[in-house]
Amino acid sequence: MKEPRLSVVAQAKNGSGKTGAFGLGVNSSVDENSKNIQAAILELTRELVIQIKGLLEQMAKHTKIKIIQVLVDEEPNDYGQVVVMTPVHFETWFLKKNKNLIKNLKMLVLDEADEIIKNETTSRSVNRAFATFKKEKMNVQILFFSATFDNQCLKSIKDFYKYVYMIELKKEELTLENVTQLYQECNSPEGKIDFIDNYLKISTGSQRVIIFVNTIKYVLKLKETLEKKGRKVYILMGKDMSPANRDETIRRFRKGEIQVLITSNVLARGYDERSVKLVINFDLPVRKQNDGSYEPDYESYLHRIGRTGRFGTKGIGVNLCCASYDFVNLQKIEHFYKTKIEKMKSMEELMDQLKKFYTDDN
């Protein structure tokens, strides 16, 4: 990140320290004696904005660097050298509302860059930022960070920046060796619910689990069905929950007051909680193709199971399968990442393995 500052595409495994890499780089590159905003970090979700701001503050605690955040219900009263926000807020707060502040910007980080570029709304905001830099002849270093970059994403980046430094991994290097990947055959969607119910019957109160579901509708249905069975579960959604409720849910989950969290992909990327030892894919993630068909969402799969096995700890990812296309998609994921997803032997073995992981970490 020294002069001359090249733009960088950096790929690294989930849980390997990407935040530390760009966080330390950002903090060491800004002038702490200047009150101008010099670096902006773009995150996909509110939860990640809050999480990353906190981590950057820890890294900067022995400096005069001030980290600020912009949220839908929170704008800073004072400015700092580094701002964390979503791409949409970069456009609305930075490019439109406070355009005079952008002249001192020298670094822009896109965390989970592949999803920011793929998403129509966030990519539009980022493209407007790039256009502004070009129009104003600004020399802004762009850092693209993610565990996953497909060919189309890399092409989009190179269309804007012909000269970027690439740090890439082979696909087979991306699969997470600290995460035991399993699948469980269920005879129906109701059988998937029964599996989770059986797990909750015998799990201890200290074991936290994230359950990923593909649609908001089924997030709500799964919560309702499990609650009727007497299970205490909580949900996390994006725009369908108020910011205050989202913040409180994450706070309680981190503290261990909530053990079971059902969510959509809003929590699939970047969320960091070492105590999560089990991730369950109620649905395998899929992405709609141009012809209307569905293919496995390989990137989302890797990011979902990457919510466990963080920073050298051990974890388990269980994929629940019932329809024939579930097994086809599972095989495609195995082939794509050149990995093996084993059939789960028994609930008892799963619990024994989880218990061992918790013991090893304590």
Question: What feature does the model see in each segment?
Answer:
Residues 5, 133-140, 201-207, 218-224, ...:
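Arginine-glycine-biased low-complexity disordered regions
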Residues 7-16, 27-52, 63-67, 134-139, ...:
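Conserved SF1/SF2 helicase motif Ia
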Residues 22, 52-53, 92-98, 112-129, ...:
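Conserved ATPase-coupling elements of RecA-like P-loop NTPase cores
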Residues 34-96, 104-107, 224, 231-236:
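Conserved nucleic-acid-binding Ia/Ib motif block in the N-terminal RecA-like helicase ATPase lobe
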Residues 79-94, 250-269:
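Conserved two-lobed SF2 helicase motor
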Residues 87, 111-113, 215, 282-283:
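Walker B catalytic acidic pair
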Residues 100-172, 333:
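Post-DEXD/H (motif II) to motif III coupling segment of the RecA-like Helicase ATP-binding lobe
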Residues 128-130, 178-228:
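Conserved interdomain hinge at the start of the Helicase C-terminal
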